[in-house]
Amino acid sequence: MTSSGKIRIYELSKDLGLENKDVLHAAEKLSIAAKSHSSSISDDEAKRIRGLLRQGSAANSAPPSKSEPEKTILSVKKAAPTAIKDVAPPIRKATSSSEISHVKPSAPANPIPTSPARPSTESVAHPAPPTRPANPTPTPTSSPPKTAARPINAPISRPAIPSRPTAPTPRSANKPSSPVPPSAGGKDPRAGQTSTTSKATTVSGGGPRPKIVSRPQSPTAPGRSAPPAKPSIPSERKAPKPELVGRPKPKRPVVAPPSRPDPEGQRPDKKRPGISPRPIGGPNQRANTSQRPGAPIRQGKTRPGQPRSAGNTLELVGKPIRRDRSDAGSAGRDSNNRPGAPTRPGMPTGMRKPVAPGELMQLQKPTGRPGTPPPRRPDGTSVGTRGGSEGATPPVERTATAPTAPKRPGHRPAQAPAAGAPRRPGRPEWDDSAKLEALRNKSPQKQRQKVHIIGENDDALTAETSGYAGEKQAVVLTASLARPAKPKSQKKPASKPVAALRKRKKETTRQRQRRRAMELRAAREAKQVRPEMLIVPEANLTVQELADMLSIESSEIIKSLFFKGITATVTQSLDLPTIEAVAEEFGVPVLQDDIEEAAKKTTEMIEETDLAHLIRRPPVVTVMGHVDHGKTSLLDAIRKARVAAVEAGGITQHIGAYQVEIDHGGQPRKITFLDTPGHQAFTAMRARGTKVTDIAVLVVAADDGVRPQTLEAISHARAAKVPIIVAINKTDKEGASPERVKQELSDQNLLSEEWGGDVVMVPVSAIKGENIDKLLEMILLVTEVEDLQANPDRLAKGTVIEAHLDKAKGPVATLLIQNGTLKTGDVLAAGPVLGKVRAMVDDSGARLKEAGPSGAVEALGFSEVPTAGDEFEVYPDEKSARVVVGERASDARATRLAQQMASRRVSLAAMSGQASDGELKELNLILKADVQGSVEAILGSLEQLPKDEVQVRVLLSAPGEITETDVDLAAASGAVIVGFNTSMASGAKRAADATGVDVRDYDVIYKLLEDIQMAMEGLLEPELVEESLGEAEVRAVFTIGKSAVAGCYITAGKLQRNCRVRVRRAKQVVFEGDLDSLRRNKDDVKEVATGFECGIGCDRFANWEERDIIEAHKLVTKRRTLSSS
């Protein structure tokens, strides 16, 4: 009871000792709003429900004894299955009408809520059952509206088989038609036969009654004029019904119907003349379904021709209970609501295949209605029993069996007797069938609960309903239910495998994910073909880049490195040995991308459209050779200028482009010279110079011979496929040996013409100017052989030789024009950089308005510093140039990223070792140079420094002057600013002093690299080194108390107090420690020199012996040097 004076449904059900469902059904019939067991209702509504339920219980408890005889009659009435099937539809209609009339009198007010099914049963019995005189009276049609609604539900169950034209008539059963009485039954013997309940009618009234009552459809409509409609249907199945009514033992074998099928089986009993009201009252659509002739027979239920088991009757009772629910609504609604009711024309719509546990509970309540006497068969036996005596089983016994039946589902089939077999005495028909159905359709727990409820509440009802169940129609219902029963059994096994699958999924979730990942990986590997050979550019790649080149996942490389003891990330750079180790593990050989690749000519400057306008152009000559072999001096001699004298350190550190005009054969001829650095750090510059050259002049010092950079220059020239002219320089020096140089060059497959080869070799002296003209003549001769041509009438194309940022002029690029003519104002794109030529100057500083093929100029007007080595091309308008630049933007970003990553290049082997020792040290640098080529050279040189213990990290590298921004970055990161041939912007010096940033400026790359290496060594912890002091020999041992003192003679060096000593005895060390006491003539002294005697004492050693050798040394700190791995 709630605080507001209301009561909840579950509280009311506890008070009444009923299930929540029963109370909800009663509320529904009384139109009381109650959605669930927790809904609250007022006291008045609760009283109404109590009254309704008490009336139903009173009706149920009244006729237990009668139910038993009815059971006996039912078993007697069993008829041939064929007759039952034919008659069932018509019987339903007749039954519905007769049932309606009977139900009204039987339970005009009381059974409406819960026992409408009973009234229907009573009406069935009314034609013949003397026990229920009230029910037989059709006069109480006034009350039938409620009861009628219930019957209507049964008919609504759509029991009317397509063959039944009268089925609709029963629905209009609202009409209280008198045909319900036996007279109507007499009109249609078929109806009596078809409805199992009509069997009782047949017993008392012969064939006619069965016809009237047996219509299950008429039960749907209490007042329906179903009887008239029945005659039409009976005509179809008249013959079978007489047989069913007249025959006490129907042809159908009485199979112990499953709990659900039994209710349907009860409907067949209703087909019997006396029992037809039962099917009607069984708004549970099962009864109606059973009445349908086409209803399939379920396993465990009696089939046509077999006697119906008492269990069927019980099921029928359950259905009436459902009909009580439907009473609250419409009969048709009940039938529709029933899940088991099929809508097929061949089966009654109200028929429910299995009896749900809820239905069983409902049936128990209606059991209170048994006040109506069970219908009797013509022979006088009650319809409910197979034998008059057998059927009279006390309801108590049935109740006892009901709970046990579900526990033994296998017992039901045994209960189903063969046609005409007598039912087991003392066992209610509904009990076994209901249990069997419950077991088939519900889980064991639900089945037990429902069966248990039935046993407690429906003892009397069970007896009555079992008697009312029509055997023949029950058989029909059983058949119809049997079909769904099989699929249900199939569903159950199917559900088990499903559960197993679910378990597998839960158990193997991670495995499934791994499997999918492996499948995806395998698919990718199948699609991707690994290269036959891996070419590594500049001996460095990141993990991700290596993974892309090998067409594998980066995680595979990381895993491989991990197993090698190296921890890496996808952005980590790998050195060449590490790359080779990883690639070989995946079966791909590694070939280092030699700088020769950079020297190859990748783009043909001459196009097909230029062929008609080609003219001879000046050659581009690159002067190459080892450092200090005289390349720039040779060019000075040719140009008659002194460039080498003004260059820092006397060495060239970036490419110089010069154009020289000479007189050849009386005609002026031009030659463009490119001077490349000879230092090993400028390999990339030499490669770029070779890439654009037409002729390579190899300078070799006669007194030095072939050196490493000489060999590199030879490889560049061969990669560029350009002819080589050898200039043997410094022939004027002492020790010069041109012949030795020729011999060494021949070892490199460069054979002099004098020795029968094809390589021109000219001995020259740049200082004295010897043979310079001969060298120029040889260059022009080779040029004529090469037939160098270009089209000056087209837009210019060429290569960026060098680029830098000038603080006054902005970005400046040295351009070599290889085809066409470059003019002031031209719009050009150099890689991803857009530019418009604002001004051009030649090597002498003279301004030019245009420059033709093979011209080398410095151009101003670029948006940013272009990359050295990029090719440029002039476009007719700025729009088209911007389109090209936009397409190259992504590549440019990748290039910049590569440059940044170059500053972080790490040898993973060294890094992992440092990390394990906790000694990983870094030197942060900010590098600014005059030109980009210098930046590349310095970065390349830094890569050559040992990195086992200290890693150089370049935070920023760019051409240009040192700015205040650079100083701020260095202050924030603790970096050192290194400038190469550059200056500091205004404010940068002041900012550096204020923040304490170290700024170093260099003009020679040697010094820069030396200082950086020293700085790296400064980060290393100094190491302790043993420094020998002297040696002494023990001559005597003196014991002083517990200790001993050794009298020694200094044989070499000296001994100092507190120094480290090592005592050797027979070449073995017996003690090593500190010298604690040093005395001479009983005086403590700090040291004793060679040739003197002294006494030595050590606190931790007293086992002195004569002839022991004492070695004295001290530990000193020493600066460590970088050790290469």
UniProtKB/Swiss-Prot annotation:
GO molecular-function term, one example from the UniProt record: GTP binding
Recorded GO CC terms: cytosol
UniProt cross-references to SUPFAM superfamilies, sorted A to Z: Initiation factor IF2/eIF5b, domain 3, P-loop containing nucleoside triphosphate hydrolases, Translation proteins
Residues where GTP binds: 625-632, 675-679, 729-732
Region (G2): 650-654
Residue ranges with Low complexity bias: 32-41, 274-283, 412-423
UniProt biased composition (Basic residues): 485-494, 501-514
Compartment annotation: Cytoplasm
G1: region residues: 625-632
Biased composition (Polar residues): 192-203
Region (G4): 729-732
Keyword Kinase: no
A UniProt-annotated Pfam family: IF-2
Composition bias, Pro residues: 127-143
G5, as annotated region: 765-767
Role noted for this protein: One of the essential components for the initiation of protein synthesis. Protects formylmethionyl-tRNA from spontaneous hydrolysis and promotes its binding to the 30S ribosomal subunits. Also involved in the hydrolysis of GTP during the formation of the 70S ribosomal complex.
Annotated family: Belongs to the TRAFAC class translation factor GTPase superfamily. Classic translation factor GTPase family. IF-2 subfamily.
Name of this chain's protein: Translation initiation factor IF-2
